[in-house]
């Protein structure tokens, strides 16, 4: 619900200014669904659906709404250590990094991404569908 509450809080000012960027963080679990993670998968899927629906409502007012769905990410404290099991989920053979996710979010927040809205962008190293 935090995504909904935060959006409600910032949207009026964005509408008033005819400009804004909303970038939600979902997960590949919301795209594919993960076994034994039904609640997590469902809520992340809801974030993706909310992103697409809200973009249709506010894009004409200069507001871009997108979501990012990371795959497996190695913790910063283990930057040099890749988790073998998680790395097997990607055709790239490794997990992602926090910086790779942050770079995508920074791009979506930039003016270079002013024509991108209503998208869920997976950053998952070409994840193998389960």
Model-inferred region functions:
Residues 9-21:
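A short helix-coil junction within the Rossmann-fold of NAD(P)-dependent oxidoreductases
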């Amino acid at each position: 619900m935090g995504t909904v509450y935060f959006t409600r809080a910032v949207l009026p000012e964005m509408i008033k200014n005819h400009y804004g960027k909303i970038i939600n963080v979902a997960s590949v679990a919301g795209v594919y669904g993960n076994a034994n993670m039904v609640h997590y998968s469902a809520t992340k899927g809801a974030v993706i659906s909310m992103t697409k629906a809200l973009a249709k409502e506010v894009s004409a007012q200069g507001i871009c709404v997108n979501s990012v769905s990371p795959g497996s990410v190695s913790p910063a404290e283990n930057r040099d250590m890749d988790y073998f099991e998680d790395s097997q989920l990607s055709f790239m053979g490794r997990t992602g990094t926090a910086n790779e996710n942050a770079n995508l979010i920074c791009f979506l927040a930039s003016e270079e991404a002013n024509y991108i809205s209503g998208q869920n962008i997976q950053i998952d190293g070409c994840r193998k569908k389960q």
